[in-house]
C-alpha cells in the first residue's frame, strides 16, 4: 500500500485487522500514526515511513510477519506497545539523531526474533517490559546517557553479555530476570538502586561485580550459585552475609 501526498496522519484503527496489507510505503508528509492504526495486520512484512515523528500506542502491535523497522532522526514519540508481539521482527534501527528520550513500556514485548537494535544516543530510560521475552536478543548497546532500566525490561532476553553505562542510576525489579545466557555483569559505580530479583534466574551468571555500596539493594538479586564480588567489610559484603550469598573480594 502506498500512501500518497496530502496525508499527514494515519487515523486511529484505520487499518486494524486488515490481513491484505503486505508492504507499507508512507509518503514523507505523514507525520503521525495513530493508536491501533495497523494493529494485527498479520500480513505486513515491510514498512517505509521516512517522515513519521510519532507512533502511538499499539500502532503495529500484533503484526506478526513484520521483519524490520527503520525509524528516522525525526522520531519524537514512540508509545507503549508500538511493536509488541511482532514475532518475526528481527531488526530495529532508531536513528542516532532521534530526539526520543525513552523506550516506552512494552514497546518490543515478545518480539521473539529481534536480534539487532540500534538506539539513539540520548535515551535516558528503558521502560517496563520493553524487551520482555526477546529471546533472540543476544547483545544490546546501552547508550551512555541511560539512567534507568525498568522492571522486567529484559525479562528472559537472550543476552549473553552486557556493558552497563557508567552513569546508570537504577536497575528495576526483575530487570534481567531469567536471562539464562549471562555469565558476568559489572555494576557501574554510580548505580543507586538494584531492584529485587534483578539478576535472579540467570543460571549461568558466575560473577556479579559491585565495587561500591548502592543506596538500595532488593532481595534475591541473584541466584545463590552466583558469586558477588565486592569489598570486604562493605555494606554490600554485609548484605551478602545476611542473605547467604557467596562472595569474592577485590
Identify what each model region corresponds to.
Residues 1-9, 19-32, 42-54, 64-77, ...:
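Structural signature of tandem-repeat unit edges
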Residues 11-14, 34-37, 56-59, 79-82, ...:
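Consensus positions within tandem repeat domains that build extended binding/scaffold surfaces
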Residues 16, 37-38, 85, 218:
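A generic structural signal for ordered alpha-helices
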Residues 61, 96, 109, 132, ...:
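A structural signal for leucine-rich repeat
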Residues 82-85, 243-247:
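Contiguous hydrophobic segments
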Residues 106, 152, 197, 220, ...:
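Intrinsically disordered, low-complexity segments
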Amino acid at each position: 500500500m502506498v500512501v500518497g501526498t496530502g496525508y499527514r496522519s494515519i487515523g486511529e484503527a484505520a487499518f486494524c485487522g486488515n490481513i491484505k496489507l503486505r508492504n507499507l510505503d508512507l509518503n514523507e508528509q505523514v507525520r503521525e500514526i495513530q493508536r491501533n492504526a495497523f494493529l494485527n495486520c498479520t500480513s505486513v512484512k515491510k514498512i517505509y515511513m521516512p517522515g513519521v515523528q510519532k507512533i502511538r500506542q499499539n500502532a503495529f502491535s500484533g503484526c506478526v510477519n513484520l521483519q524490520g523497522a527503520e525509524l528516522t532522526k525525526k522520531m519524537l514519540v514512540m508509545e507503549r506497545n508500538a511493536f509488541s508481539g511482532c514475532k518475526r521482527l528481527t531488526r530495529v534501527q532508531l536513528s542516532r539523531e532521534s530526539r526520543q528520550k525513552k523506550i516506552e513500556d512494552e514497546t518490543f514485548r515478545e518480539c521473539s526474533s529481534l536480534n539487532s537494535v540500534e538506539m539513539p544516543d540520548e535515551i535516558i530510560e528503558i521502560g517496563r517490559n520493553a524487551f520482555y521475552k526477546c529471546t533472540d536478543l543476544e547483545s544490546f548497546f546501552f547508550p551512555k546517557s541511560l539512567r534507568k532500566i525498568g522492571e522486567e525490561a529484559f525479562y528472559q532476553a537472550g543476552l549473553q553479555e552486557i556493558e552497563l553505562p557508567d552513569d546508570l542510576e537504577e536497575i528495576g525489579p526483575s530487570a534481567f530476570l531469567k536471562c539464562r545466557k549471562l555469565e558476568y555483569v559489572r555494576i557501574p559505580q554510580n548505580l543507586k538502586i538494584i531492584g529485587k530479583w534483578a539478576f535472579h534466574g540467570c543460571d549461568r551468571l558466575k560473577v556479579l561485580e559491585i565495587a561500591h555500596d548502592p543506596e538500595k539493594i532488593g532481595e534475591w538479586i541473584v541466584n545463590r550459585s552466583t558469586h558477588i564480588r565486592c569489598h570486604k567489610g562493605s555494606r554490600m559484603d554485609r548484605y551478602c552475609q545476611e542473605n547467604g550469598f557467596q562472595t569474592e573480594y577485590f
